[in-house]
Structure formats: C-alpha cells, structure tokens
Amino acid sequence: MTVFSAIPPISCWFTGRTPASWDKTMDMQTSFLDRLFEEGLLIETGVDGLYGRSGQFEDVIAAFERLIDRTGGADGAEAIRFPPGINRAYFEKSGYMKSFPQLAGTVHSFCGCELDHVSLLKSMDEGGDWTKDQKATDIVLTPAACYPLYPTIAKRGALPAGGGLYDIQSYCFRHEPSKDPARQQLFRMREYVCMGTESDVTEFRQTWMDRGVEMMKAVGLDVTIDIANDPFFGRAGKMLANNQRDQNLKFELLIPVTSATNPTACMSFNYHQDAFGQKWGLNLENGDVAHTACVGFGLERIALALFAHHGLDVKKWPAKVVETLWG
C-alpha cells in the first residue's frame, strides 16, 4: 500500500490558532493553484482537490510515465491495470477502515421503487438531503493502486520461483479536500509491487530509492528522502505511526512544490513485511508466507513539481529536462 503523507492532515483537536509559517504555506498553495487555473493547466470544478487537466498537463504525465517505463522496464514486471473501484469485500478485508476511515470513499446508488424516486425528487426540489436513502454498492473507490492486486495474485496460487513483480496504475481517491494542488482527492498512482522473500523485497525497495533519486535528478528536481509514516487515524494511529517509523517501513521522496519547509511526497517506498502475505494468503513456491514491498509514484504531484520548478510554459523548460522527458 502506498499512502502519500508529506503534509499531515490537521487533527480535529487542534485549536483555530496556527503558526505563521502555516499561513504562509497556505498562501503559497493558493497562489500556485490560482496560477495553474489561469494557465489552464488545471481546470476548476467547484470542489477542492477535484480538477480537470489540460492536454499539456497530461502530456507531462505521459512523458514521465515513459521515463518510468525506461527505468523499470527491463525488470520484467507484469503490467496490470485496474479501474478506480475495488470490490467492497476486498476493501473490507483489507482493514483500510481500521487505519484510514477519514480517507475512504464508498460508492452509493439509488436502489428504491417509484415512490422512493418521487420522494427523492421532492427532496431535491426542496433543497433537502436527497442522499439519505442511497444504499452502498459493492464498489468502493480505490484508495491505493495496489489494493486490488493482492487478492488477484492470491487467487492464482503460490507465487512462481523468484516471486512476483507487478506494474500497476490507477486513479485513487482520498477524502481530504484542500487548496493545496498537490493534495488532490482523485489522483493517479503508478506502482511497482514486489512479492517474495524478505531479502528480495527489501533489495527491490532500495533499488527503487536509488532509481528515484536519479530519475528526479535527470528532470532537474532537487529531492530528499526521509523516513515517513502513513496518516493513521485517532490515538491508536499515533502508536502505529511510531512503530512504522521505528521499523523503517516507509520512506518518501520529498520535493518542494508549494513550500520549501513542507516539501511534498512525490514517491513512496514501502515495506509491508509479511502483513499482506498473511492477510491475503500470498505464499512463496516453498509454502512460506510472502513478504511484499511497493514503490509508488504520485503522477500529478510529480507533474506539479516540474511546473513549480521549471515554469508553467513547457516550451521554456531546460533543454536537458525536455530531452529526458520527450527525447
């Protein structure tokens, strides 16, 4: 699982007072977002964190994905693409609601009769809550691109000799509306997921940490890599976050986008130990429980980092960056 958490969500117990640096960061985020709207790179929808993208914005993402392909293509990963929705039964089994209930998004639909429909329309006409009788469907919005992968691979039986390596990409949803253009509610995540022995997956993670730094260097972005934790919910979540950091299970590649003091996580490197192997029944060829790790690219965030550092006019980007992305 990859959960990007460069800018921690503000907990409900905070007071209304915020440090001056926070106010400055929020101003920078809003200013950058306004410029992106003015240039037409992002398209406002009236909902914070839900944006259309221009052809130019999409072209930058496509170019960076080709760089990902060139970097990892020789590894022989199996490419799988899932829709941005996951089987609700898989979602429930994943335990996501135990750790991140504040981020989840479920899909509800009208399932009533004609009289219920009349009541719904009346409620809409009167400005009432027409959603109260909507029922949950069997689909949940995908919270992380790799979530549908684990049950899918488990159904195949034991992993082949040498384990498994998978290339996945999906739109993901996180309910955290924000004026920060780098914290979107619907965004794309590209991942490589490794399943194998502990040494296999930790080596995989280190390889991609090294590759990530080189990739960002090639496109003119200054980065740092730091230990991190996922935004676990509640008081118990603080203990989980501390354990995650103490065991060095998560690292993030950070790039300043809207703030130099609070850089944005644009890549994430996660070691799950055998947690997903145990949960989903992922086994090695010899019957041992598989360990898993993943590397995630936040595609919109990387594109935003490029625009923030090199300018909103791609024609004026440094020649070396253009050559790296478009050849």
UniProtKB/Swiss-Prot annotation:
Q: Which InterPro entries match?
A: aa-tRNA-synth_II/BPL/LPL (IPR045864)
Swiss-Prot/TrEMBL catalytic activity: an L-alpha-amino acid + holo-[ACP] + ATP = an L-alpha-aminoacyl-[ACP] + AMP + diphosphate
Key word Transmembrane helix present in the record?
A: no
| Cofactor binding note of this UniProt entry | Binds 1 Zn(2+) ion per subunit.
CDD domains membership: Gly_His_Pro_Ser_Thr_tRS_core
Binding annotation for an L-alpha-amino acid: E191
- Gene Ontology molecular function: any one: ATP binding
Keywords, comma-separated and alphabetical: ATP-binding, Ligase, Metal-binding, Nucleotide-binding, Zinc
Residues recorded as binding Zn(2+), renumbered to this chain, are C146, E191, C294
Cofactor(s) this protein cannot do without: Zn(2+)
Quote the function comment for this protein: Catalyzes the ATP-dependent activation of L-alanine, and to a lesser extent of L-glycine and L-serine, and their transfer to the phosphopantetheine prosthetic group covalently attached to the vicinal carrier protein Atu2571 of yet unknown function. May participate in nonribosomal peptide synthesis or related processes. L-proline and L-glutamate are very poor substrates whereas D-amino acids are not substrates for ATP-dependent activation. Does not display tRNA aminoacylation activity.
Q: Could you describe the subunit structure of this protein?
A: Homodimer.
Q: Which family does it belong to?
A: Belongs to the class-II aminoacyl-tRNA synthetase family. Amino acid--[acyl-carrier-protein] ligase subfamily.
Q: What else is known?
A: Lacks the N-terminal tRNA-binding domain compared to class-II aminoacyl-tRNA synthetases.
- What is the name listed in the Swiss-Prot or TrEMBL entry for this protein? Amino acid--[acyl-carrier-protein] ligase
According to its UniProt entry, this protein's organism is Agrobacterium fabrum (strain C58 / ATCC 33970) (Agrobacterium tumefaciens (strain C58))
